[in-house]
Amino acid sequence: MDHQTLAAHEAVDLHEIVNFKTLCIAKSKLMQGLVFDQELKDLMEKDVQQSIQDLTELQAVYERASFQAPVPQSRPTPIIN
């Protein structure tokens, strides 16, 4: 399939995941400054690198897929006349 389209709920889910991964990267980088155990620092750095790779892949999906949110032609019925 050459042209991929995301439904509205998929676009929202993808946006939430990208935001979450971005916050995880920021938190891991921040916490590395508070950790003294080198083994834990190495593990946290590995987590940051993996999260950056995951985020790059998610951003590629985000850029490649178009978003489709159909707008209904009919107007809602007014509650009050």
Swiss-Prot record:
Biological processes per GO annotation: sporulation resulting in formation of a cellular spore
Known InterPro entries for this protein? Ferritin-like, Spore_coat_CotF-like
Q: Where in the cell is it found?
A: Spore coat
Principal location listed in the UniProt entry: other
Per the record, the domain of life is Bacteria
Q: Which UniProt keywords apply?
A: Sporulation
> What family, per the record?
Belongs to the CotF family.
PANTHER family per the UniProt record, alphabetical: SPORE COAT PROTEIN F-LIKE PROTEIN YHCQ
Q: What is this protein called?
A: Spore coat protein F-like protein YraG
Question: What's the source species for this entry?
Answer: Bacillus subtilis (strain 168)
What gene is this protein translated from?
Answer: yraG
